[in-house]
Amino acid sequence: LYNSPVLFDKSITIVNQFTPRNERRKFVVISDHAGYEKAKSFISEITGTVPFECLSINGMENKEEIKRVILSQKMGTQFYIAAAWNNAVMVFSLGVEAGLSEAEIQTVIIGPKRRYVYCMKCFEVSEVAEEAEIAECDHCRASLEIGPFYSIVREGYIGYPFIPVGKEEEVGS
C-alpha cells in the first residue's frame, strides 16, 4: 500500500537554503509574500544556468493557477517552494497530487512550522508546540507522550496516552 508524501515539520523536503539541482531540465520557483526574498535570492543565483519559471501566490485564491503550472511541467522539473507553513503545505499537496515525488521538491518554510500529534486514545489530531515531548489532546484532554514516529496516514506524530504523576489518585477514585 502506497501512501503519498505529506509535508510535516521534519520532512526531507524542508531545507534552510535551496540547492540547485543542475541535472534537472527546468526549475519552478513558487513563493508567497513571506517567501519572496528567499525566492528572489535563489533566482539571482540560478539565472543563466537552467531555464526557470516563477510563480508568486497569495494562498488558496491561486490554487487553480498553481495546479495548472504544476501539471504543465515536463518530467525532470525541480520545484522550489518558499512560503509560510499553510501556503507551503497547500503547494506541496498539489504537487504530490499531480504526481511529484519528494525528490522533486525543496521547501523553505518562512516562519514557524506546525506540528501535529495523533491521539491513540480518541484517534483525533491536535496541533502541538514544535519541540514539545508531552502534550494534552485538544479533544479528549488525555496527556500524551509524543513518540518519534510520524504517521503519514494519520498526518501526525503518534501520541501515547499516559497518566501524569499526581493524577493517579484522581483516576483510582
Predicted features and spans:
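FNR/FR-type flavoprotein reductase catalytic core
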Residues: L1-R115
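Cys/His-clustered metal-coordination modules, chiefly Zn-binding fingers
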Residues: S93-S173
